[in-house]
């Protein structure tokens, strides 16, 4: 009999979900949600600004509290789950990582663009030095082929990553692509493979199931799918689907549904797949760009879909949110000249 692998659930409601909240969760709200996630048996709970440690800024949006305040609010309520923090080299620093460890972080998820794994070496080295688990996060993985993803994942493995995630930042992938790329990573890596999905094409749960079938053993979700654009993989739906498919999941289905109920009154809007979200997935644009694009479209009198398609053509990457205004301004001027 073939052993069914146990799937590790990492919930990022309190980090990736921050994008849909304009980064305005309070520390008290985070503690409430984290306690419910912990009670449900979630393995890892990620907490920071949506753009990771030190992301609170004019460029990315100011959070309601500091990373330290958020982490210190959540750490005491966790009885079983590990506390995680995201860091993007170039935004967060080694000093921020030291603060996070003092605040109770046990897992660092270190994210780079899929072609820039080399900039994670210092941060991964420090995380290992401090005794933390290291998760490599290769963002915008839809933009390159499986060989390039594998090359970059091997770099992260060499830096000490304990697991490497393929990240569909734009919700642009379809199941056959996920199957091919995850399967290839599984072949070439000597460490576990993970997958993080977005729901812009309505495929987050389906893509995650495809990833697991291809060998991924660590997967992400957010309660109610909370996140930028059409959101993320819904943790509670994913748990139900994985259990129905026969995988071992250490999360209690009823309790994770209860956790989603705790979150729901805090949400600013339901997670729906609207037209702009579809364009995000179709154009392959990073999901956190959506709210910034709406603002730029209103400011310059443009259709946000046109801005998103242009950003996709220019292959923008995470961290270039300030570029949206430049693109919108240029498009507005070109539109004026054409009149």
UniProtKB/Swiss-Prot annotation:
Cited InterPro entries: 2-IPM_HCS-like (IPR050073), 4OH_2_O-val_aldolase (IPR017629), Aldolase_TIM (IPR013785), DmpG_comm (IPR012425), DRE_TIM_HOA (IPR035685), PYR_CT (IPR000891)
Provide the Pyruvate carboxyltransferase domain boundaries: 7-257
Active site per database record: 19
Q: What class of enzyme is it?
A: lyase
Reaction catalysed by this chain? (S)-4-hydroxy-2-oxopentanoate = acetaldehyde + pyruvate
Which residues are noted in the entry as Mn(2+)-binding?
Answer: 16, 196, 198
| Any GO MF annotation of the entry | 4-hydroxy-2-oxovalerate aldolase activity
Question: Which HAMAP family does this entry report, sorted A to Z?
Answer: HOA
Q: Which family does it belong to?
A: Belongs to the 4-hydroxy-2-oxovalerate aldolase family.
Q: What is this protein called?
A: 4-hydroxy-2-oxovalerate aldolase
Taxonomic placement = Bacteria, Bacillati, Bacillota, Clostridia, Eubacteriales
């Amino acid at each position: 009999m073939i052993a069914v692998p146990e799937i590790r659930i990492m919930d990022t409601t309190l980090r990736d979900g921050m994008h849909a909240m304009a980064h305005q969760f309070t520390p008290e709200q985070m503690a409430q949600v984290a306690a419910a996630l912990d009670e449900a048996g979630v393995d890892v709970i990620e907490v920071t600004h949506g753009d990771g440690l030190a992301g609170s800024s004019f460029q990315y949006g100011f959070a309601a509290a500091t990373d330290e305040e958020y982490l210190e609010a959540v750490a005491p309520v966790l009885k079983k789950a590990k506390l995680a923090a995201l860091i993007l080299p170039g935004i967060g620093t080694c000093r921020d990582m030291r603060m996070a460890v003092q605040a109770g972080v046990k897992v660092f998820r270190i994210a780079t663009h899929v072609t820039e794994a080399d900039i994670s070496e210092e941060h991964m080295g420090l995380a290992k030095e401090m005794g933390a688990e290291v998760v490599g996060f290769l963002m915008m993985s839809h933009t390159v082929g499986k060989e390039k993803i594998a090359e970059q994942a091997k770099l992260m493995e060499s830096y000490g990553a304990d697991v490497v995630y393929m990240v569909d930042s734009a919700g642009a992938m379809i199941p056959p692509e996920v199957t091919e790329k995850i399967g290839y990573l599984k072949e070439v890596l000597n460490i576990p493979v993970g997958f993080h999905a977005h729901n812009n094409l309505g495929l987050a749960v389906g893509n995650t199931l495809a990833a697991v079938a291809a060998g991924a053993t660590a997967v992400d979700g957010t309660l109610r799918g909370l996140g930028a654009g059409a959101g993320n993989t819904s943790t509670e739906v994913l748990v139900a689907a994985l259990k129905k498919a026969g995988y071992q999941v250490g999360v209690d289905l009823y309790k994770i549904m209860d956790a989603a109920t705790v979150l729901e009154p805090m949400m600013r809007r339901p997670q729906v797949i609207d037209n702009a979200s579809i364009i995000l997935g179709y154009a392959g644009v990073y999901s956190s760009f959506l709210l910034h694009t709406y603002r730029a479209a209103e400011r310059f009198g443009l259709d946000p879909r046109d801005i998103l398609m242009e950003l996709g053509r220019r292959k923008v990457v995470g961290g270039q949110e300030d570029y949206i205004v430049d693109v919108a301004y240029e498009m507005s001027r070109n539109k004026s000249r054409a009149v």
